[in-house]
């Protein structure tokens, strides 16, 4: 399952970027002096390019597209798309087995966004491929609508795969999700293989079957016991779905009355899942706002289960909060309500490791309960109730020179009206990848802002709120598939062994030799 999770992450990030890229292309209105994505020349009169599948004959400037994707509106839209799609990766997990559902999902979304950032800000910017739509000899506006850029997926996917392979967090998240996956038949288990090898080893080697009259019947008995255990021994698990728009009693596909279940006040969806799993009469549960309803000794229709497994239940969570960047000629203090701080005196970079500052919940911004604190700065490590390091912590320094200024903002330094050699500008448009610019003298005279290093900033604060969203779950009873394989293996060994020990094969060979 680990490989499938990684491939799903690659696919969802690729799909989100391609989808948004195509939206950028579809809504592009290029004129003579606006050619972010398209190259349009000598226009006079309106030109509409519509209804085409653009492949070999038309290309897009990948650098221009990267810049378009990273403007504020497109970037927010892309992050929300990725967050929404990432929820599908954990759909159907057993919440009772997931150590920390909130942190796992938040980390998954954050990692996907980090992969997206590397793709759109580094890989695509360095891609030499240019996909241009060239329109000549026209005047007026040019509208490009209802076109499909099929080459985008191939170019973008290679960038996403490279970014994903270099992301260390993805491996940890994959392992966590894999452990929470509902059990399925995995094929031959090591225990089953070992038992078969032992059974075969007892028969002897080199055609000597000492004690076969005792051993092989025992092997056959073992086969029978394995068959019986296979049909009688089941494993009970709960397949859970979070972020649901409608609970079981709210869904028209389920036709279940809430009054038909047993209500219970319980703190989280995970606890509700565990309680249902431990009750053999519980076939399904729903949970919302601290209250669970358990449905027992009843049949849940396939249309109800399909409603959730097919994804029609999804809501609009999670929330990705826009980070607040502030600055001042001093170090930050606790009363400074922000996520990041630049000391303009010494160039030090500070992060507030308490995301409760201005975190979105309940329809407003405020502070979340203390026990749900996370340390998102530089890695998104969950710290639970540990207060160490909560608050402002220095993350690093941008290396400010004496008697020179340093500043930051949401975009490149072209907005600065006055600058001097050695000044530094930090672009926090993408909070997780901060771009550092230095004002330098260029050969031949004049000065330019030179883009230098890209350093790790602070990742997005994601409030997936898994265990506080609506949740439902279904009881699943699965058989130990390896027992079936063991029974079949022992049966084969026992039958063949009995045949050898009875001399069946030797009698046939003797009969042939006499003829």
Swiss-Prot record:
Keyword vocabulary terms for this entry: Lipoprotein, Membrane, Myristate, Transmembrane, Transmembrane helix
Chain ranges passing through the membrane: 188-208, 214-234, 482-502
Source domain of life: Viruses
Keyword Transmembrane helix: yes
Bilayer disposition of the protein: Multi-pass membrane protein
InterPro entries, per database record: Virion_mem_poxvirus_L1 (IPR003472)
GO CC annotation terms, alphabetical: membrane
Residues linked to a lipid group, N-myristoyl glycine type: 2
Cellular localisation: Membrane
Family: Belongs to the IIV-6 118L/458R family.
The name this protein goes by in its record: Putative myristoylated protein 118L
